[in-house]
A protein has these predicted regions:
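Conserved N-terminal phosphate-binding loop of PLP-dependent enzymes in the Aspartate aminotransferase
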Residues: 1-310
Length: 310
């Protein structure tokens, strides 16, 4: 299902565990330590993964502004110049690692920046950022825990941004409720990982996990859930955009497949985040039996993710 050279799978039980394994793979494969991540990221709740969200960040994590067009680093720039501006942040992080004698291990992003609020990003950013990282001796890790398994209208989020990673982390939908995650990588990186480290998990790589994961893939393919995501997702986004025009406090509506993001703001023409409204909306929806969440740097973006059979 993955693009070459992602042909080796290491199984785990949670997205957090998958990210831990991915970071370890990157560090062992490169001999580096430094990881570049976004400034509004969430990749798990273990000691190492939560550091990327709440710190301490230094010395081995460098957070960079996530790319976006709604609330960009600088207003009114042409898209190519805005892309270059965000790429400068990647270059800055690489330089700071070098200045502090910390070899670069890699860059870790969610393939669609889901926790950042599913922003529309400057065209070409991901692929160009990946090139910068690889030229500096690092590898590219993409987190598909939220985006993977057809959620976005493609099998993988990295397909949307045309950027194949060196290491990919998967979770959540992989087991459709059963504790199952995985890390995909190349044979070369997998070989180094197993030669230089020891990984064991009592409940990972079991026949039951394999059966559950295979069943999930069967359902996705046999029921054409990818096709359903695209047709229903387009309809859902169009409907949300339609009613959003009636409300001043909706600044933007974005979406990929069955993943719709609604940016809550203080009022029409304003880009000031409205976290209070987002929290209230999440609670009101819960009272009506519909579970959504709020995300983004300011927790003001509503995340709507219906099941793929929606």
């Amino acid at each position: 299902l993955h693009a070459d050279p992602l042909s080796v799978l290491q199984m785990g039980c949670s997205g957090t565990e998958a990210i831990e394994i991915a970071i370890k793979m990157a560090r062992l494969a490169t001999g580096g330590k430094g990881i570049i991540c976004s400034n509004a990221t969430y990749h798990g709740n273990s000691h190492e993964t939560i550091r990327m969200t709440i710190g301490p960040f230094e010395p081995d994590f460098k957070r960079v502004p996530f790319p976006e067009k709604f609330r960009p680093l600088e207003e009114d720039l042409p898209e190519n110049e805005l892309c270059d501006l965000y790429l400068e942040e990647i270059k800055r992080a690489i330089s700071e690692f070098s200045e502090n004698n910390i070899p670069l291990a890699g860059m870790l992003f969610c393939s669609i920046f889901a926790n950042e609020g599913l922003p529309d990003i400057p065209s070409g950013f991901m692929k160009k950022a990946a090139t910068l990282v690889r030229e500096a001796g690092g590898v590219v890790i993409l987190d598909e825990v939220q985006a993977g398994f057809c959620r976005t209208g493609s099998w993988w989020g990295y397909e949307i941004n045309n950027c194949v990673p060196d290491i990919v982390a998967m979770g959540k939908p992989m087991g459709s409720g059963y504790p199952l995650s995985g890390v995909g990588t190349s044979p070369e990186i997998a070989k180094i990982f197993h030669e230089k480290s020891y990984y064991f998990n009592t409940t990972a790589s079991t026949p039951l996990q394999a059966a559950v994961g295979s069943a999930v893939l069967d359902v996705i393919e046999e029921e054409d859930l990818l096709g359903n995501v695209n047709s229903v997702g387009d309809y859902l986004k169009d409907k949300v955009k339609g009613f959003a025009k009636e409300y001043d406090m909706v600044g933007d509506v974005r979406g990929l497949g069955l993943f719709v993001a609604i940016e809550c703001v203080e009022g029409q023409g304003s880009k000031k985040p409205n976290n209070k409204l987002a929290v209230e909306f999440v609670e009101k929806m819960k009272q009506k039996g519909f579970l959504i969440s709020n995300a983004g740097q300011f927790r003001n973006v509503l995340k709507i993710l219906p099941p793929l059979v929606f």
